[in-house]
């Protein structure tokens, strides 16, 4: 990655909110906004925005060419961060699943549902409205292709694994096809893309290196 002339930076999202259902309300942004109803994924997205604040001040950084990536809960986070910060040129959520790139209204067999996050204890990742739709996933007033479309006309690369049924790769593909209409309307149909692989729920170095090819093509498409 570095040999291609990229700069790599990481974000410690837990400084914005602890990844712990029992303690997160006593950390980070929640100490400033104790009555806040947002989940920790939005708090983590805010942390990415603050990292971008720092990056754009560095002369070594091409501020118009910032890309972000994240896996699983990190994938949910970067999708939201990319949708809400126009300074981010390319967004790459990996295996982000429900609450991320996958649709709630279209799920493959074995995919997570909102109730799954109650079982795992991770419902605190999301806001109260999302949690209130437990057992009513398809009744949410909007679906996640909206987040895809909010990134347009900037670059969006969705990476998924065929065997990661929990993350609903079929729902991600359907969401991307819907969002592509927004890209087409803005004259950037090729700025949204997807790369699927034979594997499970992982964000391996080899995978990150392999997506540099599609990222390079997106860079050309969005002009960075």
Where are the model-predicted features located?
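Hydrolase active-site cap/lid region
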Residues: 79-128
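Cap/lid segment of the alpha/beta-hydrolase catalytic domain
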Residues: 1-57, 100, 104-105
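Alpha/beta-hydrolase-fold serine-hydrolase catalytic core, especially in secreted/extracellular enzymes
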Residues: 86, 125-127, 139, 146, ...
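Alpha/beta-hydrolase fold nucleophile elbow
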Residues: 60-72
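Glycine-rich nucleophile elbow surrounding the catalytic serine of serine-hydrolase chemistry
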Residues: 70-81
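Alpha/beta-hydrolase-fold catalytic nucleophile elbow
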Residues: 69, 94-95, 159, 197
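Surface-exposed acidic, glycine/proline-enriched linker/cap segments
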Residues: 31-38, 113-138
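Solvent-exposed loop/turn segments at secondary-structure junctions
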Residues: 8, 14-18, 73-75, 97-99, ...
